[in-house]
Amino acid sequence: KVIKNELNLIKEKFSVPRRTKIIDAVLNYDIEETIQKESVVITITHKGYIKRGPLNRFKQQKRGGKGKSSIKTRDEDFVVQIFSVNSHTPVFFFSTQGLVYKLKAWKIPEGTSTSKGKTLFNILPLKNHQSISSIMPLPENELEWKKLQIVFATSSGKVRKNSLEDFINIQSTGKIAMKLDNDDKIIGVKICKDEQDIILSTKFGKCIRFMSKKLRIFKGRSSKGIKSIQLAENDSIISLSRSEEHTSE
């Protein structure tokens, strides 16, 4: 009873309307702002398994060391690409059917040094007949993309060069990167400078080399490209590479 009386006295003495309001509201924020920036290693296998791991997992060793396991592969699978980027780095995934997908590195599932990773079908909206032909890390600042050029090569020998700026806005479902004939597919995509050479290799062991600046920059993504090489019957392009700089030799 004493406590009750004291509380009533306090109520009478300090009976002031509340100055603040408590309301329901939706908190808007970018989840990426909560992701720590750190150096990570991305590993991809021939059968399409991918994973992310911290770079500090790989300690420096002296020359002649045994190295450290980075991934556990299944039978007849092997690592085809490994690169180190920032966790906020955008990464492009180009499918053989001409689509491009974009993921920030932190969205790639993290795995241990002994795990095989996750299949690309689990993290990208790929259809059953699709596979990824090229995986490309890009500058985090998209303003730098205007200065870069991207070269596509197909199995039939078509090539096309675009400004990387054409690929800034990519939906979660992907975007058409290059239109292809029904029997054609993308075999490689590279960032290339005018002072570099493009090198294409064929299934039958042929090779052609030409200057990147000889390719005009196409506007948009609707073109199928231009012919780069005269292929023999049943031959096809299997690899795209670039030289560090052009030489006349």
Residue ranges: model-predicted function:
Residues 1-244, 248:
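C-terminal interaction appendages of subunits in large macromolecular complexes
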